[in-house]
Amino acid sequence: MTVRTDQLIAAPVARLIEEFAKLPGIGPKTASRLTFYLLRAEPKQALALAQAILDVKEQVGYCRRCFNITVGELCAICLDPSRDQTKICVVEEPLDVLAIERTGAYRGLYHVLHGHIAPLEGIYREDLKIEELLARVRSEPVQEVILATNPNTEGEATAFLLLRDLAPLGVRVTRPARGLPTGGDLEWADPETLGSAFEGRREL
């Protein structure tokens, strides 16, 4: 008699594997490895991981100005008086902020859209933080908006829409120079390439 694999795994273990597998970039094999690693780990290590996850969900939110991640009302970048208040770099996700900051090539502010235009995925203009961006451009001393959406089809479509919305507001609109891998995400670009793209950004 053949025993099914799911009958060999205790229910709590199977559930943890299932939850890990729901995370982006985690397949069934990696989910299983992570689960069995935690089974072997000291209880304090597993508890520390669980507590860190809870702390993130309970303490971290979004900046009311730029929508980057923060533990307060405003993020560290928005609170930094040394940042150039005349520039706003528009990105898709908070991870893109981290990627750009690692280059050291940009000292302005940010605005996180939390996604990109993708009608086939049911993501439209109203689902992004676009109106909030336009409100900032109208009310803050902004002179340049850098459209640093990802260099793929969705990112280009989002940049085109933003360019149209920003045109009547009289600000300079730029985009990082060519050289970033087409079809990729900013978070995977190496700091040197990304930094060069920012320094050589082109006007739209």
Curated annotation (Swiss-Prot):
The record's listing under SUPFAM superfamilies reads: Recombination protein RecR (SSF111304)
Under InterPro entries, the record lists:
DNA_Rcmb_RecR (IPR000093), Rcmb_RecR (IPR023627), Rcmb_RecR_Znf (IPR015967), TOPRIM_dom (IPR006171), TOPRIM_RecR (IPR034137)
Pfam families, per the entry: RecR_C, RecR_HhH, RecR_ZnF, Toprim_4
Q: Which residues form the Toprim domain?
A: 86-181
Superkingdom of origin organism: Bacteria
- Write the record's keywords in alphabetical order, separated by commas: DNA damage, DNA recombination, DNA repair, Metal-binding, Zinc, Zinc-finger
UniProt zinc finger (C4-type) residues? 63-78
Show the CDD domains listed in the entry: TOPRIM_recR (cd01025)
What biological process terms from GO does the record include? double-strand break repair; recombinational repair
Q: Name one GO molecular function term.
A: zinc ion binding
As for family, the record states: Belongs to the RecR family.
Query: What's this chain's function?
Result: May play a role in DNA repair. It seems to be involved in an RecBC-independent recombinational process of DNA repair. It may act with RecF and RecO.
Q: Which NCBIfam families match?
A: recR
Name of the featured protein: Recombination protein RecR
Q: Name its species.
A: Chloroflexus aurantiacus (strain ATCC 29366 / DSM 635 / J-10-fl)
Q: In the record, what lineage is assigned to the organism producing the protein?
A: Bacteria, Bacillati, Chloroflexota, Chloroflexia, Chloroflexales
